């Protein structure tokens, strides 16, 4: 009975010791998890005020002390807080030393009511002061802002689709993919929009006359740019675009006049650049610093238009010797119908399986590529057809896995290198392989005819052509070739 009286007196002393402390006038509710036998000690627990409340933070103020002859010292003290009434140390807590205690709590939720109390813990248990409530401010969304690059307009995460915001006196509208595609279909002005919420821009402007200034677009969340500007009139500066999350750039600028500096783009996540500049007869910008280490498809990347008209050829001929192409598997048509003539002999092409048409109708290329590891290539048909300048030693190539060499050197008038040691035992098609003579190119009805007189004259009689079943016109119209040729047994050359 005496013990219960002591506890009652202690709680009464604590409850009466504080000052008026805010919304909750009960300075101490007397909660404790133990018996208070510290009868000559006064526990002062006063939650005073909560100040400086923002959307995610607030400052707590209070008094915590022991007065008198206190047998049990404080082990820890501070504030507890929660979105529920009567918070305890089982909720959120923060320790604060001293008598006049003040601390700022962060990472709170906006527009939310919280409850806080002072607390102390000693060997007798946990004790709490009066409760004070407060509400954090509601989030005010500014909608859009100017990126640190000074060009890109970005939308805040809190911004809603359709909302507008002003940057430097210009009003921008937040859009998502559906809204953006509808605007484009209606031929609206899309120069004053925030595209932060758009992740897919595939075929966004395909087959349209689009040519608006969209340099301020935020494409940092876009992953797909497949066919984005295919067959458009687009030729605007988009060098500031953050394309670091894009994985697909297939036929992105196909058949467009685009020729802008994009050499600083981060393309490290792109896996496909297939036909990226196909039939783009304008692009010729330095992109040698691109990180293409994740690209697997480069087929037709710089391929010009079909035909031989010099005006329609791809103009691209920039130094890309430092590209890491070790993951590329497909290089067919990569430089066909173009003017490319840069050193790429140090490329690691060991994973490439298809080099068909790679330099077809490229009249300029003549760089050493004899050290290439082509051991995984299976298709070399038309690889150097009408590559009129190429004449580099490639006799050490391991072509043991190649099955198709159709028209590989047809109309390649300069090529005359020893390749008699090649292992062609798996090749089945050698039709037109060294064919020379008259050839036409261009569009039906607009053909241009050329006479090709080759110089190839090497002994390749040791070739194992036992697997070849197609060899028609193998060496058609090659008057310069006087040295022994292969002995075909399964077809007639």
Place the predicted regions along the sequence by residue.
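Terminal export signals
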Residues: 6, 16-17, 102-104, 196
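Phosphate/oxyanion-binding loops and surfaces in catalytic or ligand/nucleic-acid-binding neighborhoods
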Residues: 19, 82, 477-478
């Amino acid at each position: 009975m005496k013990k219960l009286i002591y506890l009652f007196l202690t709680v009464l002393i604590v409850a009466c010791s504080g000052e008026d402390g805010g919304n909750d006038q009960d300075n101490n509710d007397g909660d404790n998890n133990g018996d208070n036998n510290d009868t000559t000690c006064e526990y002062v627990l006063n939650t005073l005020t909560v100040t400086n409340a923002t959307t995610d933070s607030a400052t707590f103020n209070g008094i915590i002390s022991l007065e008198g002859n206190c047998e049990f010292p404080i082990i820890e003290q501070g504030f507890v807080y929660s979105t529920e009434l009567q918070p305890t140390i089982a909720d959120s807590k923060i320790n604060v030393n001293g008598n006049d205690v003040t601390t700022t709590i962060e990472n709170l939720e906006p527009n939310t009511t919280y409850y806080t109390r002072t607390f102390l813990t000693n060997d007798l248990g946990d004790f709490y002061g009066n409760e004070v409530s407060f509400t954090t401010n509601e989030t005010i969304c500014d909608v859009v802002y100017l990126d640190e690059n000074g060009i890109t307009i970005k939308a805040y995460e809190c911004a809603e689709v359709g909302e507008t915001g002003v940057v430097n006196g210009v009003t921008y509208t937040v859009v998502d993919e559906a809204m953006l595609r509808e605007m484009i279909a209606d031929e609206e002005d899309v120069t004053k929009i925030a595209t932060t919420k758009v992740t897919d821009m595939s075929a966004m402007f395909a087959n349209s006359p689009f040519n608006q200034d969209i340099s301020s677009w935020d494409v940092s969340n876009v992953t797909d740019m497949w066919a984005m500007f295919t067959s458009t009139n687009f030729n605007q500066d988009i060098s500031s675009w953050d394309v670091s999350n894009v994985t697909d750039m297939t036929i992105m600028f196909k058949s467009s006049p685009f020729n802008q500096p994009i050499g600083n783009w981060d393309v490290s996540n792109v896996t496909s650049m297939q036909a990226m500049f196909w039939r783009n007869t304008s692009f010729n910008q330095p992109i040698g610093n691109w990180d293409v280490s994740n690209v697997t498809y480069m087929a037709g990347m710089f391929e010009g238009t079909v035909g031989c008209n010099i005006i329609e050829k791809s103009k691209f001929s920039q130094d890309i010797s430092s590209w890491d192409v070790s993951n590329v598997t497909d290089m067919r048509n990569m430089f066909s119908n173009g003017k490319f003539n840069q050193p790429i002999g140090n490329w690691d092409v060991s994973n490439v399986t298809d080099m068909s048409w790679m330099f077809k109708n490229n009249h300029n290329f003549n760089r050493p590529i004899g050290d290439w590891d082509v051991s995984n290539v299976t298709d070399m048909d038309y690889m150097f057809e009408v590559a009129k300048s190429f004449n580099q030693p490639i006799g050490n190539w391991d072509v043991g896995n190649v099955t198709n060499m159709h028209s590989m050197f047809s109309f390649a008038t300069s090529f005359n290198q020893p390749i008699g040691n090649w292992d062609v035992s798996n090749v089945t098609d050698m039709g037109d392989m060294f064919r020379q003579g008259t050839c036409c190119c261009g569009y039906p009805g607009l053909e241009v005819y050329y006479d090709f007189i080759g110089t190839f004259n090497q002994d390749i009689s040791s070739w194992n052509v036992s697997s070849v079943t197609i060899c028609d016109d193998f060496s058609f119209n090659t008057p310069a070739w006087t040295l022994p040729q292969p002995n075909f047994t399964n077809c007639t050359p």
